[in-house]
Amino acid sequence: MLHIKDLIWTLYFIGTAVALEVNIVPDQGEISLGESKFFLCQVSGEATDISWYSPTGEKLVTQQQISVVRSDDYTSTLTIYNASSQDAGIYKCVASNEAEGESEGTVNLKIYQKLTFKNAPTPQEFKEGEDAVIICDVSSSIPSIITWRHKGKDVIFKKDVRFVVLANNYLQIRGIKKTDEGTYRCEGRILARGEINYKDIQVIVNVPPTIQARQLRVNATANMAESVVLSCDADGFPDPEISWLKKGEPIEDGEEKISFNEDQSEMTIHHVEKDDEAEYSCIANNQAGEAEATILLKVYAKPKITYVENKTAVELDEITLTCEASGDPIPSITWRTAVRNISSEATTLDGHIVVKEHIRMSALTLKDIQYTDAGEYFCIASNPIGVDMQAMYFEVQYAPKIRGPVVVYTWEGNPVNITCEVFAHPRAAVTWFRDGQLLPSSNFSNIKIYSGPTSSSLEVNPDSENDFGNYNCTAINTIGHEFSEFILVQADTPSSPAIRKVEPYSSTVMIVFDEPDSTGGVPILKYKAEWRVIGHEKWHTKYYDAKEVNAESIITVMGLKPETSYMVKLSAMNGKGLGDSTPSQEFTTQPVREPSAPKLVGHLSEDGNSIKVDILKQDDGGSPIRHYLVNYRALNALEWKPEMRVPSNSHHVMLKALEWNVDYEVIVVAENQQGKSKPALLSFRTTAKPTATTATASAGTGLGTGAIVGILIVIFVLLLVVVDVTCFFLNKCGLLMCIAVNFCGKAGPGAKGKDIEEGKAAFSKDESKEPIVEVRTEEERTPNHDGSNQIEPNETTPLTEPEHPAAVEDMLPSVTTVTTNSDTITETFATAQNSPTSETTTLTSSTAPPPTTAPDSNTIQSIQATPSKAEAPTTSSPPPTSSPKVAPLVDLSDTPTNNPSKVVANQAGPLNPSAATSAAEPPTVIIKPVTTVPPNAASPPPTPEPKQVKQEQSGTKSPEKEEAQPSTVKNPTEATKDESASLSNTKPLQDEDFQIDGGTFKTPEIDLAKDVFAALGTATPTAVASGKASELVSSTADTSVPLDSAKTEKTQVEEKSKPEEIDVKGTPAEVKTVPNEATQTNANESKA
């Protein structure tokens, strides 16, 4: 019993000892100067007191930088804020109670100095060309490793030997350049702690200044109280300060006659006098150096307009604007507005403007003034010395003029604005009336008025029929008044559309309809289709967006049952509501059968030798489509590529790694449980393989190889001519001397030695010391001004007049330049220099018999895709350049336009051969069903019927290529045109005769190219080779659409089972393309 009692007491004491065990978390600490840290003291067991003691043995209590918090009976937290070096040492946590005494735990706190930068100023500036030393001093408790980085790279790895890291870790750049400017990173690392720190230092390189006078010689007018500005443009870094000297003496800013702009780059001399004529110097100075430029001020007397006056008149009155001017010689006075020039002594055909000029005065008379005559008028006085111009403002006061639509439609409960636009000067007051009562009124609480600077809007929220009717807008100003009646008409629901055709299939029905005769005054928003099974009462409904339906006026209802009789009707809906329905029409869906042929739309990719073929699902025949079978081949190949099986949920297939400049045909067949559909055919042509020297559109207007070679040949010929002429006159030899002796009977050089000496004397220069001065007058040209005044010469007058640019147009037609079938397009004739013309790449969709028999198809002419004028892009690429032009100078400003032909894809009937698409949308190809049966492994490859070839004109092609512009499909009513219209509408310019489809190119002008090659003894290269373009034969519903061509890319054809894209895998094809050459549409472009 005694032993058990002793054991119990022993276990009690052991449990008490464990309860007072002290743990500190974390058990050790290391922080840098200025950082903060806390320690948690955890006690096992109940403690009456938990205390913290500093390294000096003092009990810690909460103070400014130290916090001691006891959370509960078992924990206490010590927090040290903004640690200093004195805070380092061993901290002790002591826990105690009355029964067991004390228990303690310790933690050692170490404090170190982080890696810091003491002396690393930023920015640091240096002078260009000097040896720069970038300073960076690093401070840390233990040594650190310093590295320098610039633009993300270590400067040590730079191949430039100018970069050197000195022993004190400074970076030296020998002969620093402006390109060395930037941010340099001084990075320090301490391996023992894994510590890293860095400082970005901005290095600025100062560049010595340069200065240049904007005008080396400035002319001014004397004694006319005018000012002249002398300007210098200085450059350097930092921006230099500019000072001025006159005859070597500094010019102070405080002088009364002289003033400067903010940066002193412009010096203004007020009230110029003859004494101000001198040589002025502008000096630029900055931290890196100094530079100087000089300007000569030459003082003349030029015209001065002494009188102009702003005028105000009332519409239909007559007024005279007067301008007086002085000057020596007497100046001539002309008039100009913001949009036109008015010559002196001029009278318009209608007598509206009359100008009379007198000595030092001109009078401009306006008769029957209109409000459009108001604006700014400029009086220009000019003489051989200079020009003066001043503006006067002519104000026209006129009675109000009301604009805006007079009929507005709405319905009850739908607010609408009736806008009355008023043009008047002075501003008019606008009031609204309803049945003679001024609005707003208590009788019309549903009416609000909103007024603006030039308009007034009446908001009407009709709640009954009484709110519809006439509303009067009256505008009044001091000149007069005007009123206008606006009619608010109650909108109605639209009338019913008219069903023209119902074409049922197994699971779908296509409804062709005409739009309602009446829209009810507001736009139609949706169409509602309703159908039901005959014998059932439940109608099925679906709404179709009017914007999508109106394009073709076709609605397709899907999800029908095969061999089932239905009734269908249509109705239109606008904002007012749903209109009347059409009479119900009955139809019966076809039995379960093979699916309809899919539609194919081809998109030639940018690389030029691959194509994305969109597969548009049609009627599935009442049975889900299992897959699509895709076959394709080059037309010149006997064998088809391996057949591809595309999942039914895939919407397109990619054909890659095709041969360049080759015609291809693609056949796609849909298959369901009942069998295979008729094949859908797509025909297209890949572009020509781009050359390595092909320039992109962004390459600017650089010269091509042909142009450079031509220029070198011309220079070489000119040098030969110069040398031969020199030998003829100086040494009596050379080709010209030989011709003169043999054909002109001139004596040889040995017969007249004395004459040679006399000839030399004759060609010697005059020894007179008198200067030879040639005086030419400058002719001032004013647009729309036939008269010109001679200008007296001055020291700045050039001895030769500048050559005025001439309009140059190359009249040689290009290879495939044809009239494009796009709306309001200007006919263009491309040349070997400024054209890449568009070689039409066509995608042909057709229905054709099986490959074993030749398909009978209607040919669709290739469409040259060019943008319409109305949709011309805001920015255009500069025309590429190639060989120099040799054609005569011709102005093409009156180039005739060609009316485009339209095309509509008709699934049931053949297309007109001249059908085309207009330029509005990206190029697409709509493929209709064909009867051609795709080849399979069991049957031999089909032999295609030889297609008729239409020769195209050939010509010199520029290495630069441009893409063909997109086209869009027009309204079906515009589809049918005569086949020859697209070409016969082309009219030759001036006296030239052009035959686009094989014929001669004629021009009465002299062909400069023939002259040049005749002088060289070589044959003239043919600019135009006659030929005929190939005609692609397609069957019923064929469509040819040009495809876009761009950059080249050759990739393997892959087949994927994803719905997004199916890539073709098979034998890699040879890649050959002819890049599309965009038609040049800037026919009026002038070149010198």
Curated annotation (Swiss-Prot):
Any one Gene Ontology cellular component term annotated for this protein: plasma membrane
Transmembrane regions listed in the UniProt entry: 706-723
Segments of skewed composition (Low complexity): 835-847, 854-875, 913-936
Biased composition regions of type Polar residues, renumbered to the chain: 965-974, 1076-1088
SUPFAM superfamilies for the chain: Fibronectin type III, Immunoglobulin
Gene Ontology biological-process annotations: cell adhesion
Fibronectin type-III domain: residues covered: 493-592, 594-690
Residue spans of biased composition, Basic and acidic residues class: 758-784, 1046-1064
Tissue-specificity statement: Expressed in neuron and in presumptive neural tissue.
Primary location: membrane
One Pfam family cited in the UniProt record for this chain: I-set
Residue positions the entry lists as glycosylated: 82, 219, 310, 341, 417, 443, 472
Region feature Disordered, mapped onto this chain: 758-802, 829-1000, 1024-1088
Residue intervals on the Extracellular side: 20-705
Bilayer topology: Single-pass type I membrane protein
Record function comment: This protein is a cell adhesion molecule involved in neuron-neuron adhesion, neurite fasciculation, outgrowth of neurites, etc.
Name recorded for this polypeptide: Neural cell adhesion molecule 1-A
Species this protein is from: Xenopus laevis (African clawed frog)
